[in-house]
């Protein structure tokens, strides 16, 4: 390469980009140009990571864990979300907690793609941190169901725990009666309709803001807007 520079292990495009950035760093004193160089360096590093992961997966046949994959050079924080054997999504898992008031009481935004079964106790603990106690009743999605999660919830003081899918659990172990279990299951269905409302009316189906911090801000702004509308409807005379 010109000037005797050599970039081992890299193709010509990577070497050319690195050389251009080096020349800018050495010769430019213009702040705007240096900012462009920093941006080039950022995307150049991400591009090299994409090339390396492609070489490992496609050429070497190596299976990479999701945490090591870059699926977007513009939003590198994006996680690969796999729901059972269904569709694959890109973004972040969001766990919402709602109450009888129809308000969203809490939101847990998770990085990575942890199994749903690892999340319930964290959500319950957050309720205790916010309100000073654990809820007396809890209705959760079927993906959260496990004997350990049921035991942890009961130990925390939750009297009735309803998982939408039993997954081998007995109603008698979860709730005091079939009646309570059915009531909680219907309540959880109402939470699902609230989530659909957030997606349809408040843009929660897709985030258009850049960066993980902005992603969290976008999610919370949608939730706050929905809660404010719910409160205003309750306070409006009919």
Map each language-model feature to its residues.
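Polybasic low-complexity intrinsically disordered regions
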Residues: 1-136, 140-142, 150-152
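Hydrophobic alpha-helix feature that most strongly marks membrane-spanning transmembrane helices
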Residues: 101, 109, 125-132, 143-144, ...
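Generic structural "secondary-structure junction" signal
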Residues: 72-75, 92, 106, 146, ...
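Short, low-complexity, polar/charged sequence segments that are solvent-exposed and flexible
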Residues: 90-93, 113-116, 125-127, 157-158, ...
């Amino acid at each position: 390469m010109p000037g005797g520079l050599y970039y081992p292990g890299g193709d010509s495009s990577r070497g050319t980009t690195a050389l251009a950035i080096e020349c800018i760093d050495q010769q430019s004193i213009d702040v705007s140009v240096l900012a462009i160089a920093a941006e080039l360096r950022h995307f150049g590093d991400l591009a090299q990571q994409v090339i390396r992961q492609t070489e490992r997966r496609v050429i070497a046949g190596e299976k990479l864990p999701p945490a090591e994959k870059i699926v977007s050079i513009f939003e590198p924080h994006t996680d690969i979300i796999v729901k059972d054997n269904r569709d694959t999504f890109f973004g972040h898992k969001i766990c919402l907690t709602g109450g009888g008031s129809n308000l969203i009481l809490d939101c847990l935004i998770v990085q990575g793609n942890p199994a749903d079964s690892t999340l319930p106790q964290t959500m319950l603990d957050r309720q205790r941190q916010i309100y000073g106690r654990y809820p007396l009743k809890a209705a959760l999605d079927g993906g959260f169901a496990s004997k350990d999660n049921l035991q942890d919830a009961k130990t925390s003081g939750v009297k009735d725990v309803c998982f939408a899918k039993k997954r081998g659990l007995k109603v008698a172990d979860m709730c005091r009666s079939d009646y309570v279990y059915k009531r909680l299951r219907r309540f959880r269905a109402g939470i699902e309709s609230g989530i659909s409302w957030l997606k349809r009316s408040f843009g929660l189906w897709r985030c258009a803001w850049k960066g993980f911090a902005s992603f969290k801000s976008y999610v919370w702004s949608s939730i706050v807007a929905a809660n404010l509308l719910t409160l205003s409807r309750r306070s409006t005379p009919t």
